[in-house]
A protein has these predicted regions:
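A recognition module on extended beta-rich or small alphabeta surfaces enriched in W/G with H and D/E
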Residues: 203-212
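Catalytic alpha-helical scaffold of carbohydrate-active enzymes acting on polysaccharides/glycoconjugates
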Residues: 1-158, 164-198, 214-225
Length: 226
């Protein structure tokens, strides 16, 4: 029986709390604040989305055998860089914030770091001044994994890093928390030492040439015969 494996983000930004704390006031200070799935109904229950509390539906999918979630991350994006860009009054970051959104990357050059504004991974900062040290990475990740278990009722044993983007030290961080395997790209991005590595097969020929269907089917056949 085929069961889906959604890689699950356990928390996200609390836009209301951050706004109330002055992140858009131009005061030069902004602290990242979180909404967790295990103790709140999440951001989708709030404006502008207002989709209601979806937690029971998510867990029903697991209870009925539709999917078996595993850990993806705590935020998906670089929260330290995001909060700093808000604090400095960056127009694009504030524009997305007002819409209840973050972003992946845009081309404004940061004068101090000589990096372009990019917040696309929680583990490896594109803007190096915001990179978490080893102790921070461990605490950040282990707290996220505990939140995953609090919501789903079991510990995650497999992960896929956001955007398959993180340093090799993440292998030890995950292994110390009991994670045994990682999914990454076939070319090697996102695979980690010390874990069982599972290269991901892209199953969307729309992104490739028409030959991709043949490649997908051939790969599937080889895997089935192993």
């Amino acid at each position: 029986r085929v069961v889906l494996t959604p890689f699950w983000i356990v928390a996200g930004p609390d836009f209301e709390a951050m706004r109330d704390a002055g992140c858009l006031d131009g005061a030069g200070h902004c602290e990242y604040k979180e909404l967790w799935w295990h103790n709140s109904s999440g951001g989708l229950d709030r404006p502008p989305f207002e989709r209601g509390d979806l937690r029971a539906l998510y867990q029903e999918g697991f209870a009925r055998g539709l999917w078996h979630p595993e850990y993806h991350g705590r935020s998906h994006f670089d929260t330290a860089a995001w909060a700093a860009y808000l604090a400095e009054g960056d127009h694009i970051t504030a524009l997305y914030f007002e819409a209840g959104l973050t972003y992946y990357h845009y081309g404004r050059l940061n004068a101090s770091s000589r990096s372009f504004h990019s917040i696309h991974s929680e583990y490896l900062s594109d803007d190096g001044q915001f990179q978490k040290g080893p102790a921070q990475l461990t605490a950040w990740t282990h707290e996220g994994l505990r939140a995953f278990e609090a919501f789903w009722g079991y510990a995650s044993r497999v992960t896929a890093m956001p955007c398959h983007y993180g340093g090799p030290e993440m292998g030890g961080v995950f292994a110390a928390a009991g994670v045994a395997g990682v999914e990454g790209e076939e070319k090697g991005r996102g695979l980690l030492p010390g874990l069982r590595n599972s290269p991901r097969l892209m199953f969307d020929p729309a992104f490739e040439s028409p030959r991709a269907w043949e490649d997908v089917l051939a790969h599937t056949q080889r895997e089935a015969e192993r």
